Amino acid sequence: PYFQIRKGRRASLAACALLGSASLVLPAIAQEADEDSEARYETVVVEGRRVSTADTAIGLDEATNTVAVTRAELLSAPGGISGLKMLESLPGFNVQTDGALGLYEFGNSVTVRAFNLQQIGFVLDGVPMGRSDAFGGSPIFRYVDNENLGSVVASPGAGDVSLPSYASLGPIVSYNTVDTSDTPGGMISYTMGDDNLERSFIKLETGNINGLSAYVSRSKTDSNLWRGPGTIDREHIEGKIKYEFDADTFIKFGYVHNDFNDYDSPSGPESVFESDYYYAYLDAIPETGCIAEISGVYDYNGDSVIDGSDFSPIFTGSSCTSYYEDRINVRDDSLYSLNFQTDITPNLMFTATAYQEDKDGFGVSPDSYSNSLGIYNRQVAAGLDVVHPRGVQYGLSGVGGSRKGVVAGLEWQVANHKVEFGAWYEDEDYNRTQQRLNKTNGSADGNVIWDEVAYYRRNYTSTRKTTQLYLKDTVSLLEDRLNVALGVKSLSVDYALNGYRDYNDYEIFGPQSVGETYEDSFLPMVGAVYDLNDTDQVFASYSQNYALPRGADDIFSIASTDASTEPLPAPKGEESENYEFGFRTNRSEFYGSAALFYTTFDNRLVAGSVINPATQQPEAFYINAGESKAYGFELSGVYQPAFLDHKVYFDGNLTYNHAEADGYILADSPEWLFTGGVTYEPTEWLVANISGKYTGARYADFAESYDMESYSLLSAYLDLGGPNGFGVPENVSLRFNVDNLLDEEVPTAFVYAGSAYFRPLNPRTFQATLTVRF
């Protein structure tokens, strides 16, 4: 709803040099065309302050349906929104987030065609971002600020074979940051809004100093939750240093640090939010249903006698865990990258990216006395060194680890062929711990007693060693009117998990070692794009994809048997085949694209949800749904009519997506999606927009037993700034954004797929941003 144009994108060599992308995104180094062929693409026929060039808008020359959110569109986005919300305006993407900012990691869902968030590959400036799990993953929204993004380029069904990912079953989304500037300067912006939102952003540029250029930026976001007590606190730092040896050779270092913490808010059945739309955790410890003293249960003071001098648990009722204070999420992540590009010969280009990601963090959920007591009793009987629960326990989940890798490739232009080949290697480790600790007085407001563990649940390390190889040849024929791409890749992932998987390993089996090797050495991709005339193209593609099973840690940490004597069968790797056929046009007042798609899956894993008795919130588990399929179409376009003096333009996307498994529609997969908007630019200093989003009816589960109603949402913005006759400096701008303009209430906006637990749509939310560029 925040972006006006829904676009495709062609990654050119200039863009690769500008952005330093060593992701081996397809550079468009075509053979020389005749003058008439070149002239066809020199004119941009639809223009505006928030309109990109036509080749970006419609994915010119791409053999797959490639769409993008561009920098022009990002200029109108609300300050501080999640990187996932930038996908809302792209055709086919069903994005549901919690709150206007969308920063709550356990309230995000994305589906495109039949894929979900964990089956989409993400790449940032050539760095593969691994999996999108909140626990142990590398969700893209931790690593971007929209002020630094140049484009977000998505292939909804068939990403290029050169793009590195072990998670993708087809879709790839590349986030590309802006390059360093040749001129010194910077920008400062400040945002204020509802829910006590305050956000600052500052960026400083050195300019080009004898080939060396750099920038650094920092944003700080503080806000209350829109529903209930609790806050959001995010500090985000980005930096980039680039040295250019010549026009084709550079080295670039990038750094991102994200320090984030927020509080949970509850999900619930639809009936809960119909009764109380703002249902939330409590801002004080309740007395009713909470306070009930139990004496003589444990020798807390260690004098070998249980008597009146020992502590007596007081906070033993079930309602004690409805207090908000012990429901927090903390993440501290850093990403380092080093990009290098050079031309070995005039026709042979080498690119490489080395990277390291360090992850640390924890989450906390309170655990009730009764739930802790039952597990404590089991672990005492097993001889574990645990302490009787004191009341409400501190439910600590620790997450941490690192990823190190390198991506490298060569591109060789010979005659009418562009040959690309390369490799990716990554070594990832992830540490997960879970235990329940006592607190002073057994109160959620008490201090953590770090040497009193009420029970243990998990303590394991999982590793992923990934190797991907690829080879691709793009042949230009018929005087560059026909381009045919033939590619193949291989993927191998060695997965292992070592340690205490779950309760049974502590109580019965002891630490375990499990794992599996996932590999497919032949994953082909074939695509073609043909120029029908000066304005129209058709394209088609076919690809096979293979991925590490989603939720691998959750699956391999099932501890129902002793893995050394009775190992559980390992899940199979997920497989998919994707077919696309499409058309794009670029005319004087309109450009657009249309694509038909068909996708089939084998060994598709779908997420179900069960209610955790400790937290009373959904917890994911995974089911092999076997074979599934999806088919439909995606339409997108922009219309700027001449009779309105090119001051008004209309944009829209329409998606039909039928995704099913065993005859049942997949959960959280609406068949119809629509986004559209109207933008008005009467002067150089004013841009106004109103946008709408329609999400069709869908199901909460995989058996079509719980349907969710469709809903619509309007958003708007007004952007003031630029050349004017009022004496206001042209480098100063003021933007107003409104989300959920009509203040719609939708109790089932977000669903934990496979359950009937929901999160409601945020109310109307307003913010204003003042920006100064210098």
Protein language model features and the residues they cover:
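N-terminal periplasmic "start-of-domain" segments of outer-membrane beta-barrel proteins
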Residues: 43-78, 109, 154
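Membrane-embedded beta-barrel scaffold of Gram-negative outer-membrane proteins
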Residues: 339-355, 359-363, 531, 537-543, ...
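Transmembrane beta-barrel wall of Gram-negative outer-membrane proteins
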Residues: 185-187, 192-222, 227-304, 328-349, ...
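Short acidic/polar hinge/loop motifs at secondary-structure boundaries
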Residues: 110, 127-156, 176, 272-273, ...
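Extracytoplasmic beta-strand/coil segments of soluble accessory domains associated
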Residues: 84-128
